[in-house]
């Protein structure tokens, strides 16, 4: 019987390709060398430096599984290994990277127009544009069926009203992908620019955990979203749950 290896109980190491090991090792070197020395201070101060997103971008971590728009196009396994190394230091790094990649870039890539993809994905890939995703609400958590945020059709676009809470990256984000229901009850994705009138994305302060994560609200008071900023490829629960 083979000796049990406590560090690798599922024998994952034996199942990885050489490329996957190289990606994992590069992520580990960066996380341990560059991020680990920062986290105690950041956790004490409830601080996250957005410049780290540009470092993620240089390493190809943002949108890493997307096959185009200059993204790395790596496997889901490889991306999971990167995420594990970020999480090994602190969940704030994995959260910031994961929200940008999986909750903002991926829906834009899947459901967005060509113009939306060209406008947002290259900048988000490089960490020059930070995104957040608004689903969770104060009264219903992440239960999309109970969503109260509304998108009312007006000339040239929509007006969004509602509040999203516990939103990773919102205090730093230049763009928010907000999921809202229209007047027929259909769920759609709306891209809101930070400087939009009626939009406020303040920080949630005094957290007892995940303190180095930049977490906040998305408050919307009849925020105008032009037609061209609505994701055209989805109008159902499939969008936020993809």
What is the meaning of each model-derived region?
Residues 161-201:
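A short core secondary-structure module
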């Amino acid at each position: 019987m083979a000796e049990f290896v406590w560090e690798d109980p599922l024998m994952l190491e034996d199942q990885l390709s050489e490329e996957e090991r190289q990606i994992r090792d590069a992520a580990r070197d960066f996380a341990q060398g560059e991020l680990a020395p920062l986290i105690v201070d950041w956790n004490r101060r409830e601080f996250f430096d957005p410049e780290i997103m540009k470092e993620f971008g240089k390493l190809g971590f943002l949108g890493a599984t997307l096959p185009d728009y200059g993204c790395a196009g790596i496997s889901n396994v490889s991306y999971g290994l990167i995420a594990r190394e970020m999480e090994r230091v602190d969940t704030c790094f994995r959260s910031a990277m994961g929200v940008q990649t999986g909750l903002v870039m991926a829906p834009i890539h899947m459901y967005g127009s060509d113009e939306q993809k060209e406008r947002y994905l290259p900048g988000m890939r490089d960490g020059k544009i930070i995104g957040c995703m608004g689903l969770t609400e104060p009264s219903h958590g992440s239960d999309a069926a109970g969503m109260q945020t509304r998108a009312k059709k007006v000339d040239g676009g929509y007006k969004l009203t509602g509040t999203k809470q516990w939103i990773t990256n919102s205090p730093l984000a230049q763009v928010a992908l907000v999921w809202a229901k229209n007047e027929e009850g259909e769920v759609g994705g709306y891209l809101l620019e930070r400087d939009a009138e009626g939009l406020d994305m303040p920080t949630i302060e005094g957290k007892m955990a995940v303190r180095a994560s930049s977490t906040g609200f998305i408050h919307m008071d009849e925020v105008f979203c032009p037609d061209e900023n609505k994701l055209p490829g989805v109008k159902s629960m499939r969008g936020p749950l993809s």
